Amino acid sequence: MLCCMRRTKQVEKNDDDQKIEQDGIKPEDKAHKAATKIQASFRGHITRKKLKGEKKDDVQAAEVEANKKDEGPVADGVEKKGEGTTTAEAAPATGSKPDEPGKAGETPSEEKKGEGDAATEQAAPQAPASSEEKAGSAETESATKASTDNSPSSEAEDAPAKEEPKQADVPAAVTAAAATTPAAEDAAAKATAQPPTETGESSQAEENIEAVDETKPKESARQDEGKEEEPEADREHA
């Protein structure tokens, strides 16, 4: 029995040894390799994340730099355009006209001198004109202020002047109304007292009556106006 047991154990060991020999790797080595693979994969994952973040930062920095580079040439182009326009405007102003075939060689210099003199003459009157405009504006402002300051006193002076003509008009209207009413009443009385004997007299009486009727509303209107103006004058006096 013991011999059989020993033989079987040896056979099992031999089988394991054969497997190990065939594979060439022990189980411990397999476990160690598996652990190293896991660690390597984890490290690789971390490094990939870092690389992605760095790449994003690099991409953003590259975009910013590209935008700056694009803006730089645009600004330079704008400045160059502005300088080109200024130089182009200055060139025709300062440049002399081409000489005509019939003129002498000294004409360009004379033209330049004439242009310089004209420019100085234009600049000289412009300065006094601007000073005169400033002085005129200051005078107008002072005049407006003085008028605004004096406006209350002028209104106070105008008020009595307005009251006096109103007071003068009221008695005149009253006297005119008093003068017209007796004449109208006399004409009406005469027209009624005389008998209508003839057609001419009757027509005259009718005309007188019509004249009286026309004058009555006018007189009443004048009296009403006089009555309205009297309390206004009293109020103004008060």
UniProtKB/Swiss-Prot annotation:
Membrane topology: Peripheral membrane protein
Modified residues (Phosphoserine): S41, S151, S153, S154, S202, S203
Ranges of compositional bias, category Low complexity: 84-95, 119-130, 168-199
Bias-annotated ranges (Basic and acidic residues): 9-32, 54-83, 97-116, 213-225
Entry's localization field: Cell membrane; Cell projection, Growth cone membrane; Synapse; Cell projection, Filopodium membrane
Location of Phosphothreonine modifications: T181
Record carries keyword Ion transport: no
Changes after translation: Phosphorylated. Phosphorylation of this protein by a protein kinase C is specifically correlated with certain forms of synaptic plasticity.
Region described as Disordered: 1-238
InterPro entries cross-referenced by the UniProt entry: IQ_motif_EF-hand-BS (IPR000048), Neuromodulin (IPR001422), Neuromodulin_C (IPR017454), Neuromodulin_gap-junction_N (IPR018947), Neuromodulin_P_site (IPR033137), Neuromodulin_palmitoyl_site (IPR018243)
Record's GO cellular component terms: cytoplasm; dendrite; filopodium membrane; growth cone membrane; perikaryon; postsynaptic density
Gene Ontology biological-process entries: axon choice point recognition; axon regeneration; regulation of growth; tissue regeneration
Residues bearing a lipid moiety (S-palmitoyl cysteine): C3, C4
Composition bias type Polar residues, residue spans: 139-150
One Gene Ontology term of the molecular function aspect: lysophosphatidic acid binding
Location of the IQ domain: 31-60
Highest taxon of source: Eukaryota
Annotated Acidic residues bias: 226-238
Keyword terms: Calmodulin-binding, Cell membrane, Cell projection, Cytoplasm, Developmental protein, Differentiation, Growth regulation, Lipoprotein, Membrane, Neurogenesis, Palmitate, Phosphoprotein, Synapse
Family: Belongs to the neuromodulin family.
Function of the protein: This protein is associated with nerve growth. It is a major component of the motile 'growth cones' that form the tips of elongating axons. Plays a role in axonal and dendritic filopodia induction.
Subunit and interaction comment: Identified in a complex containing FGFR4, NCAM1, CDH2, PLCG1, FRS2, SRC, SHC1, GAP43 and CTTN. Interacts (via IQ domain) with calmodulin. Binds calmodulin with a greater affinity in the absence of Ca(2+) than in its presence.
Name this polypeptide is given: Neuromodulin
Gene name of the record: GAP43
